[in-house]
Amino acid sequence: MADATDSKDPPSLDKQRHIKYWERCHSTFLPSPYTAYDSTRLTFACFTISALDLLSVPLTPADRAAIRRWVLSLQHPDGGFCGSSTHSYVGQDARKGTANLAASFFALILLGLAADGEDEERAAFAGVDRAKLLRWIRTLQRKDGSFGQNVWGGEIVGGRDMRHSYLASCIRWMLRGDVQEGDEAWVEDVDVDEMVAHVRRGQTYDGGVAESSQHESHAGYAYCAIGALSLLDRPQDSALSPQTQNALKEGVPNREGLFQFLASRQFRYLAEEEEEDEVEENFIESKIGELELGHVGFNGRWNKKADTCYCWWVGGTLEMLGNSSVINAPPSRRYILDITQHRIGGFSKAVGGPPDMYHSYLGLAALATMGDSDLKELDVGLCCSKETTRKIERARAGLLDSIRGERKGWEGDGFW
């Protein structure tokens, strides 16, 4: 790991090592600790392929075809996607597991990533049962506007936290389109007003966001809340600015309080004190005006240690709110590149740890949000490259045309 010392020259992303790290993740077995998370294989696949995309590493035609076949094999017959085939019985179709929101989100992103060229991009969602997926999402919404993760035994399960609202909002934007009742592609929508009301009820006394106003605020929940609202406001063409921000305005009652909460997540990294006293490491917060030098990390909650991923959760949230200048970017960039960038590629959670896929991907996302020249431009709302978002928009248009009988997908023209 790089030395945590200041330098006159700004630190740089070791791009080739990160490419090698992600290529290993793509082509070889993952380390044994990942075994327990095999049911979330779609998530790891999306991190891997999206990281390579951010690093401008193209997929081969064979890889693109393989990704597409595998993702579609995990589509559930009742709507949505399963995270992997782990929970299906021997000899049973992989898609007979349980669909969940996270897997469905990552499946759609992966299908977009696996397309190259206009024809492939327009056919990227061919094979996705759009109507079943959108209807399935409606079954996950409770009367209070919150969403669960999946349906088990006829009941919505998985808590009421903002992650589910975010994932539902993303899937809705990627698939629904600007379709009016009476159109062949019409599917009844989720209750958007109740979704916004649920997010609104999640803001806490300190300006942050939690599952409800009585729970502990968390920067990750803040990102999911703002992401959910932003996707509700986003035009079908993401290159256009929203004409209104009704969801964002209605869903955040205390905007200044949220800025204060997010700005307070940034604090000076104290390497020497970490060595002297493990109990006190990274707990001291500093005033924003004193953060011009050194390394500055982020935590997700009050009185917690710095963590690579919160450079993303905080920075991404402020970017969506149009207030990224609230934080001091250069020392945050130094923290990521000097402290948690690993010698074998990837990023660790904190100083001294090994790299892992979650923190390695969100570390890249944070740097892309800061405008790192070695990375593609990032769509902060979907946490993928803007190029991938454009592919998803073309995939949506192609799918809607196919539903209306105006265009055939891959299965119809024998592309694969």
Label the predicted regions.
Residues 1-416:
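Preference for long, amphipathic alpha-helical scaffolds in soluble/luminal domains
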